[in-house]
Amino acid sequence: MAWLAGERWKLKAFADFDAGHGVDLYKATYARTFQVDPADVTKKQRQIGKVMELGLGYQGGVGAFVNFARVYGIDLEGEFLHAVRNTADPSDLRAGEEAFEWQSAQPDYVADLSPDAWAACYAVRTAWRRAHPAITEFWAALGRAVTAALSPTHRAGMMHRAGDHVLVTAYPHGDDLRDVLIRLPSGRSMLYPGARPAYASERALMIFEDCEYSATPTRTYSGKLCENVTQAVARDILVGTMQSIEDRGYKIVLSVHDELITECPDAPEYSHGELSRLMATAPEWAKGLPLAAAGFEAMRYRKD
């Protein structure tokens, strides 16, 4: 996602860590978000940084952050609240308090956090977005491109750019709907069939009215499209390495998320180091994308 959006400080953080002279990403994220020295980031603050990375990257808000925080055992009413109050911008906390007043007045609001903890989560969300201007702009660029593709002025074949690597177009689908295609940097496209612009009351970017995979209309938004694009690009990179891996004599027997499990002769010319190098080879269309891989050798599949 950082590469797609052009978030240069984060790309440098990845590259520095891979080169062995940088802090890990969760510390770097916490430090950048709250403008503190990475060396001063505590173990508990690093855990907050991890939840920020996992929960906020695809336009997640307070709800997404809370869900991930609970998965990773963060006490939002205790140590988290103390850590945020000590490092967050006071104006972000005040904005969080004001946002809570509005949110808590909504008929569908469920009170599962204290006002102070909710405001602290909102402050984290605000600070993370401010620390990632290129990523937040990429969300907006995807939204603008899709909106343009669904607009009355769009004509079949017109391309709308979202950042430096992604193009969006659309083709008619019946009388009122369109098939939206998002072209990835690899040249492959993702299809969103039977789409229309969302109404303001639907709180979405576009709606799929005619989709064989769902009996009811499905809504999506810019952050979710960012997730779709990011995961699709990751897939293209992984699949793109498979042929060279097979050609080198590593028989691929299974893939699990971002892992490849291979079988090969128990001989010195085969190693997990070489396999990692092959997996971390960027394709021609992904110049400037930092890649790293690690692995191990075993007689059966297991987690490292």
Functional labels for PLM-detected ranges:
Residues 1-304:
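Conserved catalytic core of nucleotide polymerization and phosphodiester-bond processing enzymes
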